[in-house]
């Protein structure tokens, strides 16, 4: 059976994203690349990506995580399907929210092209939807390695390279 990516709806809910005409295409490519690389059944699956602003993501972060501040990306994995759902109903993976101002600021601060950082955040958010996490050091290492491999497929340089160099400098 050939690979079928999840149906992905990108919702642009903040006007600030109008400055990034390719944002939707960047997100869709990143999600498809991530889905192709992970061992998760994505045929007949759906997810939504909300391109928001800091205010919208701050509200979500406060309501769902108790953190009254914006962040770059939030993921909300869907609950497992219930036995009462029809067999042919699409399987909802969940939702991802990305904050424009934080994403822009981080990309600028790190000297990265905006679309590279957006790709990274979309991949990161998707991996959370399919069960990856970074609560422990080993989980973080596994997730970061997978992110690197997916992003390399998209032609995006290692987003952790500078962090790894800084960690190495502290050790030496």
UniProtKB/Swiss-Prot annotation:
Chain residues that bind Zn(2+): 124, 128, 134
EC number(s) stated in the UniProt entry for this protein: 3.1.-.-
PROSITE patterns: UPF0054
Keywords from the UniProt entry: Cytoplasm, Endonuclease, Hydrolase, Metal-binding, Nuclease, Ribosome biogenesis, rRNA processing, Zinc
GO molecular function annotation: metalloendopeptidase activity; RNA endonuclease activity; zinc ion binding
Classification via Gene3D superfamilies: Metalloproteases ('zincins'), catalytic domain
Localisation: Cytoplasm
GO BP field: rRNA processing
Cofactor(s) the protein needs: Zn(2+)
Source superkingdom: Bacteria
Record's keyword annotation contains rRNA processing: yes
InterPro entries: MetalPrtase_cat_dom_sf_prd, YbeY, YbeY_CS
Any one Pfam family match given in the protein's UniProt record, by short name: YbeY
Cofactor note: Binds 1 zinc ion.
Keyword Endoplasmic reticulum: no
Family per similarity comment: Belongs to the endoribonuclease YbeY family.
Free-text function comment from the UniProt entry: Single strand-specific metallo-endoribonuclease involved in late-stage 70S ribosome quality control and in maturation of the 3' terminus of the 16S rRNA.
HAMAP family, per database record: Endoribonucl_YbeY
Protein name: Endoribonuclease YbeY
Organism listed in the record: Rhodopseudomonas palustris (strain BisA53)
